[in-house]
Regions:
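His/Asp/Glu-rich acidic catalytic environments and adjacent acidic regulatory segments
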Residues: 1-50, 74-262, 270, 274, ...
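Active-site-proximal, well-structured secondary-structure segments within enzyme catalytic domains
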Residues: 132-136, 184-198, 228, 232-376, ...
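Hydrophobic alpha-helical scaffolding
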Residues: 23, 158-161, 205, 212, ...
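C-terminal, non-catalytic "cap/extension" segments appended to globular domains
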Residues: 10-12, 25, 113-118, 138-150, ...
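Conserved helix-loop functional segments at active or binding sites
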Residues: 327-338, 361-364, 393, 397-405, ...
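Glycine- and acidic
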Residues: 20, 204-219, 256-272, 304-313, ...
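Post-HExxH zinc-binding segment in Zn-dependent metallohydrolases
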Residues: 411-440, 449-451, 455, 529
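Active-site recognition of the HExxH zinc-binding catalytic motif
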Residues: 249, 378-398, 420, 425, ...
Length: 602
């Protein structure tokens, strides 16, 4: 393996970091905007509170609110994104603190707007939408649906103030990135450093079993030392969610969270149920193939991320990735390729691994500015899939920003991972077409399973099942502790993986690794999105002109429900057919892996 040490942020190459000057040229400009929006917030409250009584006033209020929200959105990203890459920088922390002050002012003074919209007469709203804002039809439909769950203006203001305060997620991030210190470990006579970033991106997928397992032992030893702190943070978070659900009249915290993300309980339950029964057998076969080829008799959870063919890894530089992505995603059209070029030319992506940087990857798009992407580049080809994934988010929300107003700039969470996962499948299909070598083909398919499907349909799905069971325990007032959380996680893992592996000691603490548990019911949306993404990518593979249909869907933002968006894309998720087809596709890929491996072993 390649030994790696994390370096301080000030030692990374600037050309591979994201450019915050796309938002504000200087900190002084940022601070001036903070002062300006503070005044604008107070003026908005003074001008419109209690006065949304006629269509003309409501129209000007909505437009002004959208202007404020767009600037607030820029401010939030200028504050939060540097924290994700350099959280030990005092200036970065100070800028975040300044934004948190404005966030409190925003929440305390503008909560009236949502409350007064909900209180408007339904016919008044319909006439307003028809005559003034037909583009916000679905937005106001959701407003009407919220009526029975909306509290008094005073209560909503208290909740808004409370929600604006730094919460349990902040505590989780501090514990994870600032307090945890990992012991180095020895393997094969060498000493290796360990950290969250190093384990997640390097050691956990090392092809040397001794390195991999010693790293896991070191990693989980540290997690175990903080399990009670992390459990307290997480349990407090879900108790807060249960409290809000009860206040708003929901019997189940799951229904409350689904409503908040424009979700559908039937689709949610089907996703949770079907993947356990139908996908698990395919994944077990894949893991057994890994064990067979690596001659591992006691396959463990810590071994799941190894490559099927460890001697066949494709190296990839950051600069080379640009050409690959333009060719692979070129099927999506000229505008898509232009966006890829822009993302490199204008430094949308933060590539380096450094001390104080968050783990994982994400894309945070500021409409009409940039899709800021966080990665931890490892120099391997599989990072191209990660970047393709995040560029899918970037194009989606840049397109939404171009075609929709700020109130339609969101996206139903059930659909949000479709554009990103679709890109991963498109890249795989491109690679399979351009290189027919048997060993390369096996590498691509193996990567599809281990990166695209295992990550999105297994890792995040197991998070979702765990969440589902914990939330149901909260609904039933059952006691939760660190040990209870760990037992539930272990039970979920053992049920899914069956006899294909042993859940090694410490792996039950996997619930401490992901931030998604502080984001409502986000984890299940990965498998939901990949269900849609698989269908769309294969449609485009069969008929490249279908890309135009897909790009049109990506311009709709939150102006439609997830069901309607998927239907417009030609993938009707109101039935279980797309999910069943996606699972069958995974089974087909596993069959291909067995066939190709047997052919290569002859």
């Amino acid at each position: 393996m390649t030994e790696m040490k994390l370096i301080p942020r000030n030692e990374v190459e600037e050309k591979y970091t994201w450019d915050m000057t796309l938002l504000y040229k200087t900190d002084e400009d940022y601070k001036a905007s903070l002062e300006n929006i503070k005044k604008e917030i107070l003026d908005f409250k003074a001008t419109y509170e209690g006065k949304l009584t006629d269509h003309a006033t409501l129209d000007t209020a909505v437009k002004k609110y959208e202007e404020l929200y767009e600037e607030y959105y820029k401010l939030s990203h200028y504050a939060e994104l540097p924290m994700a890459v350099d959280r030990f920088n005092d200036n970065v922390v100070q800028n975040m603190t300044l934004f948190e002050d404005i966030s409190t002012i925003w929440a305390g003074n503008l909560s009236f707007f949502d409350t007064e919209l909900v209180e408007l007469d339904e016919q008044f709203i319909k006439d307003f939408v028809k005559n003034y804002r037909p583009d916000l039809e679905y937005y106001f439909e959701k407003i009407v649906q919220e009526k029975k769950h909306t509290l008094s203006k005073e209560a909503e203001q208290v909740i808004a103030n409370y929600e604006s305060l730094p919460g349990y997620f902040n505590l989780y991030e501090v514990t994870k990135h600032e307090d945890m210190e990992f012991d180095s470990f020895e393997a094969n006579g060498k000493t290796f450093e360990n950290s969250f970033v190093l384990y997640e991106n390097l050691h956990g997928m090392d092809n040397d079993t001794e390195v991999r397992r010693k790293a896991a032992k070191s990693f989980y030893k540290t997690l175990n030392s903080y399990k009670n702190t992390s459990a307290n943070e997480y349990i407090s978070q879900i108790k807060k969610e249960k409290m809000l659900a009860t206040m708003r009249g929901y019997d189940s915290v799951i229904d409350y969270l689904l409503a908040a993300q424009d979700g559908n309980r039937e689709l949610y339950d089907r996703q949770i149920r079907t993947l356990m029964t139908d996908l698990a057998p395919h994944i077990r076969r894949y893991i057994k193939l890994l064990a067979r080829e690596h001659k591992i008799e006691d396959m463990q959870f810590a071994d799941c991320k190894i490559n099927l063919d460890p001697d066949f890894e494709v190296d990839m530089t950051i600069d080379e990735s640009r050409s690959y992505l333009k060719k692979a995603l070129g099927v999506l059209g000229e505008d898509y390729v232009k966006m890829i070029d822009e993302s490199y030319d204008k430094r949308w992506t933060d590539f380096p691994q450094n001390i104080g940087k968050s783990t994982g990857g994400f894309c945070a798009t500021v409409p009409n500015v940039a899709g800021f992407i966080l990665l931890s580049w490892t120099g391997k080809m599989n990072e191209v899939f990660v970047l393709a994934h995040e560029l899918g988010h970037a194009y989606h929300f840049m397109s939404t920003g171009k075609h929709q107003t700020m109130l339609n700039n969101d996206c139903p969470l059930y659909f949000v991972e479709a554009p990103s996962t679709c890109n991963e499948v498109i890249v795989s299909n491109y690679l399979l077409k351009t290189n027919t070598d048997t060993r390369f083909k096996r590498w691509v398919i193996s990567n599809m399973i281990s990166r695209t499907y295992f990550h999105n349909m297994v890792t995040h799905y197991l998070e979702a099942v765990y969440q589902d069971r914990i939330y149901k325990m909260v609904d039933n007032n059952e006691m939760l502790t660190a040990d209870v959380l760990s037992k539930v996680k272990r039970d979920v893992m053992e049920e899914f993986f069956g006899d294909s592996l042993v859940v090694n000691e410490g792996a039950e603490l996997t619930w401490m690794r992901q931030p998604h548990y502080y984001m409502g019911l986000y984890p299940y949306t990965y498998s939901a999105g990949l269900t849609i993404g698989t269908a769309i990518a294969n449609k485009i593979d069969n008929d490249s002109s279908y890309a135009d249909t897909w790009l049109n869907v990506l311009s709709k933002g939150s102006s439609m429900s997830a069901l309607d968006l998927s239907k417009l894309a030609g993938c009707d998720v109101s039935t279980d057919e797309p999910l069943k087809e996606a699972i069958a596709y995974v089974g087909h890929l596993v069959d291909e892996l067995y066939n190709l491996t047997d052919e290569l072993n002859k």
